[in-house]
Amino acid sequence: MVDYSPGERRSQWDRFGNKVSLLVVLLLLTTTVKAWASDQIVVPERIRAVVAAPDRSEADRALDPGRHPAEMLAFFQVSPGLRVAELGAGGGYTTELLTRTVGPNGVVFAQNNRLILERFAEKPWSDRLAKPVMRQVVRVDREFDDPLPPEAHDLDAVFIVLLYHDTVWMKVDRSKMNRAVFQALRPGGIYAVVDHSAPPGAGLDDVQTLHRIEEKTLKQEIEQAGFELAGEADFLRNAADTRDWNDSPTAAGERRGTSDRFVLKFVKPSGANPKPPAH
């Protein structure tokens, strides 16, 4: 046994203490990263019941494995009584999940523009809106530059799911769109964004050919409107995705639902002044 002097023992203890402190810091950082990545999302039973509802269509259920609706609703904190909106609702897969979750005391403003309705969605959208479960949905036919009506204010959340990239090739003024969303949300309200990931450096190059957008570019655009990034989730990530194929619903075929997708939670800061859309 080595007999250290008091000074040497103190030095040894200091080094040990430094190592312990470093270990604690690393553990805290690891915990923070896990919370930020949201790889352990707790799904409330009420949300599981929404997804498992027996009157949901078989077509919607077939999309569930590739969309993880329970995790999405839980991550974005959708609950009964909320006022929410969806931009680019399309045929209404996400809209129906939202209205089932917010329930009879909530409301969902569901927007489509003319192009989406005329080319893809009018028939399935109208058919879905006729279902009794959709009675809390307000149909909104407006362009993306000014997507929400005046009555859509103090919203708890606004969703745009797998569609932000389309607003690029549709020549939408995205700066104006994002400011309109900012204005419609209450302080602390959530801008919920899900989209297909393009490789680093791609920027906006793949928005029409591959229906993908670079995550960094999208973050920059939304943060410029005044939003703060409050969280990310990885339940739609796929590291095996080569990100060089077209993942649009009509082109993806059997690969639909397997693309690498980012899930981002932006928040309107509490006390933020409204930022009206530019005219």
Model-derived regions, located:
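S-adenosyl-L-methionine
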Residues: F120-P149
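Class I SAM-dependent methyltransferase Rossmann-like catalytic core
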Residues: I47-F75, S79
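A conserved beta-strand element that flanks and buttresses the S-adenosyl-L-methionine
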Residues: F159-L163
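Conserved beta-strand signature within the Rossmann-like core of class I S-adenosyl-L-methionine
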Residues: G188-H196
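Conserved class I S-adenosyl-L-methionine
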Residues: G81-G90
